[in-house]
């Protein structure tokens, strides 16, 4: 039972570390966003903390009573030092990049909605970079909410169509 528990913990720790890497290195290639903008602004910091705790947890789980005392002390201290890596990466580099995790949405306006599916809309999103507020970015996106917490957003160009299910929001 203990072995199953430790293997499950190791699996979750590795999953959080992979999630951190994919989110910050490849996250702009995915079109899934949080619908709650307040939570979305806190999520990178939560993910950084979970990754650091996961790295430290993997080192702690590597401590064995059969090892010599100095080896366990090295694992304990080394785990703490390696757990600082996500904090240093985020606060030293990622925090100052103007990527999707640093975009602050100033205004979001729905211009069309689908009369067949209420979860599909076309929005104009005005966002500004969280690090320097000088550059304002306007995007027209197709948004499809697939759970109460997530939505998919893809860039779209608006074209006039005769027979469409889209209705203009007034």
Task: Spell out what each predicted region is.
Residues 1-6, 35, 61-75:
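Membrane-interface helix-boundary motifs at transmembrane edges
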Residues 4-15, 46-50, 73-80:
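Alpha-helical transmembrane segments
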Residues 11-63:
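Membrane-embedded alpha-helical segments of integral membrane proteins
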Residues 68-97:
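Internal/C-terminal transmembrane anchor helices
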Residues 92-117:
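Alpha-helical transmembrane signal-anchor/signal-peptide segments
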Residues 108-170:
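Extracytosolic and intramembrane catalytic regions of membrane-associated proteins
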